[in-house]
Amino acid sequence: MFSRVFAVASLAALALAGPLSVRDQCNTGTIQCCQQVQQASYYQSAFQEIGLGELLAGVTGQIGTQCSPISVVGASNGAQCNAQTVCCTNTQFNGLINIGCMPINVNA
């Protein structure tokens, strides 16, 4: 008898809990709006051609260029990013180059 009550109560609790809401987070810095996002390997060959290949040595992931910070609060109230919204781990030259970028969706 108690096993049935326990089983029904467990299923009811799972049904009421529902799915968890997943939100985009940027724990490593500010959310950026970048005009262009490319794999680091795309830029490594160009940097090597001009003799600056060692600057991106060891950099993996994506690199954003011409980025400007946006806030999640602003994004939900109508601020728009007409390019790629990303979360980057390292911002250089006031957003001209952002390293370690990961695309995110701020509309979720």
Swiss-Prot record:
InterPro entries in UniProt: Hydrophobin, Hydrophobin_CS
Lineage: Eukaryota, Fungi, Dikarya, Basidiomycota, Agaricomycotina
Free-text function comment from the UniProt entry: Aerial growth, conidiation, and dispersal of filamentous fungi in the environment rely upon a capability of their secreting small amphipathic proteins called hydrophobins (HPBs) with low sequence identity. Class I can self-assemble into an outermost layer of rodlet bundles on aerial cell surfaces, conferring cellular hydrophobicity that supports fungal growth, development and dispersal; whereas Class II form highly ordered films at water-air interfaces through intermolecular interactions but contribute nothing to the rodlet structure.
Keywords: Cell wall, Disulfide bond, Secreted, Signal
Name of the protein in question: Class I hydrophobin 3
Pfam families, per database record: Hydrophobin
GO cellular component: extracellular region; fungal-type cell wall
Signal peptide as annotated in the record: 1-17
Gene Ontology molecular function, alphabetical: structural constituent of cell wall
Family the UniProt entry places it in: Belongs to the fungal hydrophobin family.
